[in-house]
Amino acid sequence: MSTDVAAAQAQSKIDLTKKKNEEINKKSLEEDDEFEDFPIDTWANGETIKSNAVTQTNIWEENWDDVEVDDDFTNELKAELDRYKRENQ
């Protein structure tokens, strides 16, 4: 009989803990609903990332091989690129 009482007490503690956790979760979700509206940026066209993307790409394509890197990976990559160019011509 005492095991039934102990089991009932343990179950009631578990239920209380679950209720407390649910209340905490509800409160935290309610607090997350609030957000701040930020003002819209009014940048000139030349200052945006999208407008600079073309020039950024051209710089990368023109200058990517200017840096001398002499390690195994780079050498294998260059050899693979040369082989790919030969096979697809």
Curated annotation (Swiss-Prot):
<keyword id="KW-0597">Phosphoprotein</keyword>
<dbReference type="GO" id="GO:0034515">
    <property type="term" value="C:proteasome storage granule"/>
</dbReference>
<feature type="modified residue" description="N-acetylserine">
    <location>
        <position position="2"/>
    </location>
</feature>
<keyword id="KW-0804">Transcription</keyword>
<protein>
    <recommendedName>
        <fullName>26S proteasome complex subunit SEM1</fullName>
    </recommendedName>
</protein>
<dbReference type="GO" id="GO:0006511">
    <property type="term" value="P:ubiquitin-dependent protein catabolic process"/>
</dbReference>
<dbReference type="GO" id="GO:0000502">
    <property type="term" value="C:proteasome complex"/>
</dbReference>
<dbReference type="InterPro" id="IPR007834">
    <property type="entry name" value="DSS1_SEM1"/>
</dbReference>
<dbReference type="GO" id="GO:0006406">
    <property type="term" value="P:mRNA export from nucleus"/>
</dbReference>
<dbReference type="GO" id="GO:0030447">
    <property type="term" value="P:filamentous growth"/>
</dbReference>
<feature type="modified residue" description="Phosphoserine">
    <location>
        <position position="12"/>
    </location>
</feature>
<dbReference type="GO" id="GO:0035753">
    <property type="term" value="P:maintenance of DNA trinucleotide repeats"/>
</dbReference>
<comment type="subunit">
    <text>Part of the 26S proteasome. Associates with the nuclear pore complex (NPC)-associated TREX-2 complex and the COP9 signalosome. Interacts with CSN12 and THP3.</text>
</comment>
<keyword id="KW-0647">Proteasome</keyword>
<dbReference type="GO" id="GO:0045944">
    <property type="term" value="P:positive regulation of transcription by RNA polymerase II"/>
</dbReference>
<dbReference type="GO" id="GO:0072742">
    <property type="term" value="P:SAGA complex localization to transcription regulatory region"/>
</dbReference>
<comment type="similarity">
    <text>Belongs to the DSS1/SEM1 family.</text>
</comment>
<dbReference type="Pfam" id="PF05160">
    <property type="entry name" value="DSS1_SEM1"/>
</dbReference>
<dbReference type="GO" id="GO:0060090">
    <property type="term" value="F:molecular adaptor activity"/>
</dbReference>
<dbReference type="GO" id="GO:0005829">
    <property type="term" value="C:cytosol"/>
</dbReference>
<dbReference type="GO" id="GO:0051726">
    <property type="term" value="P:regulation of cell cycle"/>
</dbReference>
<dbReference type="GO" id="GO:0070390">
    <property type="term" value="C:transcription export complex 2"/>
</dbReference>
<keyword id="KW-0007">Acetylation</keyword>
<comment type="function">
    <text>Versatile protein that might stabilize multiple protein complexes involved in diverse pathways. Subunit of the 26S proteasome which plays a role in ubiquitin-dependent proteolysis. Also associates with the TREX-2 complex that is required for transcription-coupled mRNA export, and the COP9 signalosome, which is involved in deneddylation.</text>
</comment>
<dbReference type="GO" id="GO:0043248">
    <property type="term" value="P:proteasome assembly"/>
</dbReference>
<dbReference type="GO" id="GO:0043161">
    <property type="term" value="P:proteasome-mediated ubiquitin-dependent protein catabolic process"/>
</dbReference>
<dbReference type="GO" id="GO:0008541">
    <property type="term" value="C:proteasome regulatory particle, lid subcomplex"/>
</dbReference>
<dbReference type="GO" id="GO:0044183">
    <property type="term" value="F:protein folding chaperone"/>
</dbReference>
<dbReference type="GO" id="GO:0000724">
    <property type="term" value="P:double-strand break repair via homologous recombination"/>
</dbReference>
